[in-house]
Amino acid sequence: MKATELQKFTDEELKQMLDDLKRKLMDLRFQLEMNKLTNTSQIKFVKRDIARIKTILRGRELGVRR
């Protein structure tokens, strides 16, 4: 998801999405270890989404506007 799309969500919604993505990342890592994950690039995309959400939340915390 793009950062501009994520800006529209509230902090609570972003925190919920962050929790869901962390769970998804954990599941993907387990699948990778068990050799059941066929598309390993999914891990990269989930990690990037987590970073985007954390960046937006931190920016709001500091009062940074873009």
From Swiss-Prot:
SUPFAM superfamilies: Ribosomal protein L29 (L29p) (SSF46561). Signal peptide: none annotated. GO terms for biological process: translation. CDD domains: Ribosomal_L29_HIP. One of its GO terms (molecular function) is structural constituent of ribosome. Gene3D superfamilies: 1.10.287.310. Keywords: Ribonucleoprotein, Ribosomal protein. Pfam families: Ribosomal_L29. NCBIfam families: L29 (TIGR00012). This is Large ribosomal subunit protein uL29. It comes from Kosmotoga olearia (strain ATCC BAA-1733 / DSM 21960 / TBF 19.5.1). The gene is rpmC.
